[in-house]
Amino acid sequence: MVYRSSNPALAPHLFQGGATTERMTLDGTVNKTLALLALVSIGAMFSFSAVAQNPALGMLIMIGAGLGGFVLAIAVLMIRPNNPQILMSMYAILEGLFIGAFSYMIENYYLSGGEGIILQALVGTVAVFLTMLTVYKFGIIKPTEKFVLVVSSLVGAIMILYLFNFILYLFGTTVPFLHSSGPIGIGISVIFITVAALMLIVDFGMIENGVKFGAHKNMEWYGAFGLVLTLVWLYIEMLKLVAKLRD
């Protein structure tokens, strides 16, 4: 069975086996995932340090890197280059720049005494990833078509909500409770983190099927890219949750 992922970087048709002898492997996908995460980390550390020295850069970096990363992600998903590593590497760096600036702003401006919040969010993200990997490995949750359909619908709804919130932000307001630190706001963050965690199961399933059905070697990059997209989203949601709990 080929599962339909809610992650556009892991679309099923990308993982069809080709006529060449170079095939997608799990080790190759893991290595490429680690490479992209390393670039995200480098970008994050650079922007965090830059914003710490000049806080006025925070919003500029967030907007510039956020928009740049969005454009590159769309380019990768629409163009589908045979050698996507350059665009994906550029995306990872920009995403890292965004995360670094965002993390600094949350730690130093959203909270008073927010020291340690970034480490807590990182630990939480790693814990969720390892938990879902274990759950997937032992077949506790399987990415069946019905499961993927539900997750896809939830992810789509969340993205629409964020888009609507962004539009409202342009007019000086936001969706009620979305960013609040009360019980409803915390509950929303927990729901979003749960959906992101379930999306990891979908991504694991798609990558496994790519390896199983002999997808082309360059699909390792797409598998890694999709996984990094999910992990970045998970970290951002985890950081928001920890901030709300500490507020």
Residue ranges, per PLM feature:
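A hydrophobic alpha-helical transmembrane-helix feature that marks the membrane cores
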Residues: 1-247
